[in-house]
Swiss-Prot record:
This is Regulatory protein E2. Residues 243-290, 298-311, 357-367 have a biased composition (Basic residues). GO terms for biological process: DNA replication; DNA-templated transcription; regulation of DNA replication; viral DNA genome replication. GO terms for cellular component: host cell nucleus. The gene is E2. It comes from the Viruses. Residues 312-344 have a biased composition (Low complexity). Residues 418-502 are annotated as: DNA-binding domain. Residues 211-242 have a biased composition (Polar residues).
Amino acid sequence: MENLSERFNVLQDQLMNIYETAAQTLEAQIEHWQILRREAVLLYFARQKGVTRLGYQPVPALMVSEAKAKEAIGMVLQLQSLQKSEFGKEPWSLVDTSTETYKSPPENHFKKGPMPIEVIYDKDADNANAYTMWRYIYYVDDDDKWHKSASGVNHTGIYFMHGSFRHYYVLFADDARRYSNTGHWEVKVNKDTVFTPVTSSTPPESPGGQADSNTSSKTPTTDTASRLSPTGSGERSQQTSTKGRRYERRPSSRTRRQQAQARQRRSRSKSRSRSRSQSRSRIRSRSRSRSRSESQSSKRRSRSRSRRKTSATRGRGPGSPTTTTSDRAARSPSTTSSATSQRSQRSRSRAGSSRGGRGRGGRRRHRLSESPTSKRSRRESGSVRLHGVSADAVGTSVHTVSSRHTGRLGRLLEEALDPPVILVRGDANTLRSFRNRAKHMYTGLFSSFSTAWSWVAGDGIERLGRSRMLISFISNSQRKHFDDAVRYPKGVDRSFGSFDSL
């Protein structure tokens, strides 16, 4: 207990020296985060041992200390990478390297030079919102090289240049839906109006366009349209952001797998509606046929009764006594009930025999119509892989090998058509870290990794969705072993595919 308290006090003294010195070097900032990491590890260990206080300092929960230690490790790795770049000699303060600055929009980027931006909605000075624009943004490209980019503001939002792409990390249209009634806003930089709202039919430029000289904060005042239409603003916001304001990307289009699933759902609903309509039509036809048969049987009964009456009158002759109503009532009820029961049994036996014949015949016809097709399909599917795969057919299949292939020859022939890959999607830094970790931990379970890349819109130059990375394999079995063994980072999803060649 005393040993832990002494070590904790030493770490506190080192932190106080750094705060008093306030050295603006990356070496001092890295040392600061190293001390914070050791402090979190010490508190974690103390909590594990049941210690709740170190002097006057209460010991937090294990999850809190673990999260702080991981945060410190991540900041140390980022600062060490920045130290190796050409920007390592620039002055860096504690504020510039704090987690609050690093996590603020644009998230997971180092930034310097905050500037206040005020946006007034509906020309009402009381209906205003404040934003922060950073003069310089530091980011890493796909080749792990650091770059320094200037930030700017226009009527659409606040952005920074990522190469030739304009990445918006604040969109005024998102807050205009909440704060504005007319869809108008004006942008002020240092209390000077930079963009005033005017009524115009020309829509504002879409995010992701090329940078021009009249949109940065250092340019003179210009007038431009910033009217928010109900449809256009929704489309612009959907095009520029997928995960809030984090990625400044357009959402990716639907994949072929999603489109195929949607088509399957439509076909299932159509087949269900058809089967329901067919069953209803069958029920109606059966009810109609029953009603017709009942009407015909009633007609036959009435005819037979009339014939019996006429034959009875003819047989009696003029001298025979007539039967009155009282005589009919005097007949025994047993004879009438037995006659009706015999009639009903005959009709049931006839209906059952006819129905049973139809059922047996229907089942027989169903088997006869079904068996040739199934046998033919089995013969065709079995005969496809009796031959080898031609050179032109290698790499042409886009489906994974199904489980119906039990032999090695069939599986090898199928895999020859399908050079497999895995496409992973997520944040660019997360994918790069995953690639570096997989190269050390899963050697031999893959062929190669690609760099992080993105799709670009066909109607613009903004990036679509999240970053992508491809992992290639020699065979499907190798891909399966890799997928079973690897643990994908949080927020990263995958999909399987193949190419003609790699």
